[in-house]
Design a protein with these regions (language model features):
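Sec-dependent N-terminal signal peptides
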Residues: 3-12
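Surface-exposed loop and adjacent secondary-structure segments within mature catalytic domains
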Residues: 19-35, 89-93, 103-107, 113-123, ...
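Acidic/histidine-rich, surface-exposed loop or edge segments in extracytoplasmic proteins
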Residues: 31-50, 128, 213-217
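The substrate-binding groove and active-site-proximal loops of carbohydrate-active enzymes
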Residues: 46-52, 132-136, 214-228
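Divalent metal-coordination and catalytic microenvironments
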Residues: 54, 83, 131, 169, ...
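A non-catalytic alpha/beta surface segment that caps or lines the substrate-entry region
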Residues: 55-96
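Short HxH-centered metal-ligating active-site micro-motif
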Residues: 83, 117-125, 129-138
């Protein structure tokens, strides 16, 4: 009886923990957020981490953020072999967005040996890409909360940070692999989380979500640069 009671309490604890999941868990405390910028749940229908985000939901949220925030512009750089968009977000202050071409040209000038550019007021460029392997999904899922923070956080700290940098954000390096993995994991997920490594959810069928459409490991394309991703 004691064993059954203990098992019952453990199951209820994990069910309660799942029910308490919300965006505040991931965000810095003591910061106000622009209410006109939608949270991930308001757009994709679930909290960050409640389900593995599919690529279509990830892209929909990023496009929605770009429409809601003057800190974000979005560019479609092409499509994967399965036709999924390859998006790039540019995140900075509205002032930097107005001068983005000038900032780009100044950074190009820095590569010239005889350049004489004053870098004291030049914003730095930060490139961030997420989940190059589709079944390493924490990056793409964290990207939901991260992009929301950059778009909606208010106060002098975030304003100063974005004034000093231009963030280029690729929410998903490997859209086809991410979609393949998310479908598998969500399809085989239990209503209550299961930590047992033998659970079907954790064992994808071959080829899994690591690779792109042609089962190519994206880490092998840094030098040849032959794939659209």
């Amino acid at each position: 009886k004691k064993t059954i009671l203990a098992l019952f309490l453990v199951l209820n604890f994990f069910s309660y923990a799942q029910d308490q999941l919300n965006l505040n868990y991931y965000l810095p405390q003591g910061i106000t957020y622009n209410p006109s910028v939608p949270t991930p749940k308001e757009v994709i229908g679930h909290e960050v981490g409640e389900w593995h985000v599919t690529h279509d939901k990830l892209m929909f949220y990023m496009q929605t953020l770009a429409e809601a925030s003057d800190r974000i512009t979005i560019e479609n750089r092409g499509a994967t072999f399965e036709g999924r968009p390859i998006l790039l977000l540019t995140i900075t202050t509205p002032k930097n967005h107005q001068n983005i071409e000038q900032i780009r040209q100044e950074h190009i000038t820095l590569t010239e040996s005889n350049s004489n550019v004053d870098i004291s007021e030049m914003p730095i460029i930060v490139y961030q890409g997420f989940s190059i392997h589709g079944n390493e999904p924490s990056g793409a899922n964290a990207g939901l909360a991260y992009a929301y923070y950059l778009a909606a956080a208010q106060g002098p700290e975030i304003e100063a940070m974005l004034d000093d940098m231009v963030i280029l954000m690729d929410p998903s390096y490997n859209p086809d692999g991410l979609q393949r993995f998310a479908y598998w994991a969500n399809t085989n997920k239990s209503i209550n989380l299961v930590a047992d490594n033998n659970e079907r959810e954790y064992h994808e069928v071959w080829p899994g979500g690591r690779t792109n459409h042609y089962w190519f490991d994206m880490n092998r394309d840094w030098l040849p640069v032959q794939l659209p991703e």
